[in-house]
């Protein structure tokens, strides 16, 4: 990770951490950098945004920077992150930009950069952007006269993406009662239209964005509202998205939450049954629940574990040709259909499995028993030193031995804070608490705690 850009873009509080000046300079750099690949100097860059009040401000700043460097800016307007990825990789765009802070509160925002292949932008390009932001590359010339770039309203690109989503459904949804929680974010422009077109009877909540209510007690991080809707209206299934709709969690017909781990299990089994699970493997992160691995073992599915972050999941998948991978949080990547997590594709694929198997979501998820989990953070003076301490390691090993094959312990550093995270999964919450506290007590006793 760099000074400005992390694994999921440049993110922070609008006009505090991420300012309009930053956005303008990012636009200036990208317009100039990609313009060098064109005889006429005109790069072609597509932009999407979520519903935050500041997203419009950052869009204007990016467009000003891009066009001032001679690039043409194509505006999808309010749309999802995966739609920007799709448009970038299926048309002749040099790159894509998504303005969003995903599941963060409205006062945060972010700039996600996507290359022409629809993937997260390569680190060497990000490094050059950071140099420019820090004034290390000198001045970029301004375009003048007819060389100034154009701005194009490009809702046609978003509509084409909607058509692509509909083409992925191999069954009619007629007669199925579906709840959708749009999180007052990007999904509100797409999800209902797609499900309606496929024949579902849709019940939608949190689809009235006002610039400040994105992710506010709604969506995939606050799924209780969707659970209530499914139970109250006796729906067959529900899907909750985050602010930019690259995540999706589900609610079964009983109103119970279906996590990303459940989704990986359900779709992994579906693919294996059809001899389409490449390498017989599903890609997970180290934070996936212990119960997922036990369930995979029971059906003979193998798995790869990556660091936390859909970036690392995608890298593992692309290097090995794997078809399905993701995170407990609902970032699920179906590599045959997308290069990023795509919440709406996730929902469509869960519908496909239900219809193909003629089973409810609760029936499909039943073999996976989620273990109780306790995760605690402890602020420390030196997170690497604390984690590498011999006594701390001994305490972790003692817990691992005590749990045996009936649980696990994971201790890892935060990537962004001076924090060590201690997580235990075991047969009961009480057992988890006991073992987490044992390790934290050792960290405190060695003087690392702040």
UniProtKB/Swiss-Prot annotation:
Pfam families: PGM_PMM_I, PGM_PMM_II, PGM_PMM_III, PGM_PMM_IV. Mg(2+) binds at residues 102, 242, 244, 246. The active site is at 102 (phosphoserine intermediate). The modification Phosphoserine is found at residue 102. Binds 1 Mg(2+) ion per subunit. Activated by phosphorylation. Keywords: Isomerase, Magnesium, Metal-binding, Phosphoprotein. One of its GO terms (cellular component) is cytosol. InterPro entries: A-D-PHexomutase_a/b/a-I, A-D-PHexomutase_a/b/a-I/II/III, A-D-PHexomutase_a/b/a-II, A-D-PHexomutase_a/b/a-III, A-D-PHexomutase_C, A-D-PHexomutase_C_sf, A-D-PHexomutase_CS, Alpha-D-phosphohexomutase_SF. One of its GO terms (molecular function) is phosphoglucosamine mutase activity. It catalyses: alpha-D-glucosamine 1-phosphate = D-glucosamine 6-phosphate. GO terms for biological process: carbohydrate metabolic process; peptidoglycan biosynthetic process; UDP-N-acetylglucosamine biosynthetic process. Its EC number is 5.4.2.10. Its cofactor is Mg(2+). Disulfide bonds: none annotated. Catalyzes the conversion of glucosamine-6-phosphate to glucosamine-1-phosphate. Belongs to the phosphohexose mutase family. This is Phosphoglucosamine mutase. The gene is glmM.
């Amino acid at each position: 990770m760099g000074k400005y850009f992390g694994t999921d873009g440049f993110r922070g509080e609008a006009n505090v951490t991420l300012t309009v000046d930053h956005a303008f300079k990012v636009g200036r750099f990208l317009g100039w950098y990609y313009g060098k690949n064109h005889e006429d100097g005109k790069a072609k860059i597509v932009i999407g945004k979520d519903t935050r009040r500041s997203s419009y401000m950052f869009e204007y700043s990016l467009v000003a920077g891009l066009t001032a460097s001679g690039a043409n800016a194509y505006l999808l307007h309010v749309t999802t992150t995966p739609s920007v990825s799709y448009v970038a990789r299926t048309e002749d765009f040099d790159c894509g930009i998504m303005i969003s802070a995903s599941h963060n509160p409205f006062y945060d925002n972010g700039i996600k950069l996507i290359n022409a292949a629809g993937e997260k932008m390569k680190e060497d390009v990000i490094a050059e952007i950071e140099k420019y932001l820090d004034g290390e590359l000198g001045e970029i010339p301004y375009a003048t006269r007819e060389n100034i770039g154009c701005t194009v309203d490009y809702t046609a690109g978003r509509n084409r993406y909607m058509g692509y989503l509909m083409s992925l459904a191999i069954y009619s949804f007629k007669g199925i009662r579906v709840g959708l929680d749009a999180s007052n974010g990007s999904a509100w422009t797409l999800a209902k239209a797609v499900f309606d077109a496929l024949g579902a009877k849709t019940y939608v909540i949190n689809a009235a964005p006002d610039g400040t209510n994105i992710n506010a007690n709604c969506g995939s991080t606050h799924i209780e509202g969707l659970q209530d809707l499914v139970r109250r209206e006796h729906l067959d299934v529900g899907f909750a998205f985050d602010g930019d709709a690259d995540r999706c969690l589900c609610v079964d017909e009983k109103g119970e939450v279906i996590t990303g781990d459940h989704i990986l299990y359900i779709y992994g089994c579906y693919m294996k049954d059809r001899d389409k699970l490449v390498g017989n493997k599903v890609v997970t992160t180290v934070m996936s629940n212990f119960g997922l691995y036990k369930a995979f073992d029971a059906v003979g599915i193998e798995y790869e574990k990556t660091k936390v972050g859909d970036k690392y999941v995608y890298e593992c998948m692309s290097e090995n040709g794997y078809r399905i991978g993701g995170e407990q949080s609902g970032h699920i990547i179906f590599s045959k259909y997308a290069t990023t997590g795509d919440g709406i594709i996730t929902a469509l694929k869960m519908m496909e499995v239900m219809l193909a198997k003629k089973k409810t979501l609760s029936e499909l998820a039943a073999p996976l028993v989620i273990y109780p989990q306790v995760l605690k953070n402890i602020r420390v003076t030196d997170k690497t030193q604390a984690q590498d301490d011999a006594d701390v390691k001994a305490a972790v090993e003692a817990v691992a031995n005590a749990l045996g094959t009936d649980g696990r312990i994971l201790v890892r550093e935060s990537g962004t804070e001076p924090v060590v995270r201690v997580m235990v999964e075991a047969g009961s919450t009480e057992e988890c608490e006991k073992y987490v506290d044992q390790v934290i007590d050792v960290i405190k006793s060695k003087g690392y705690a702040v």
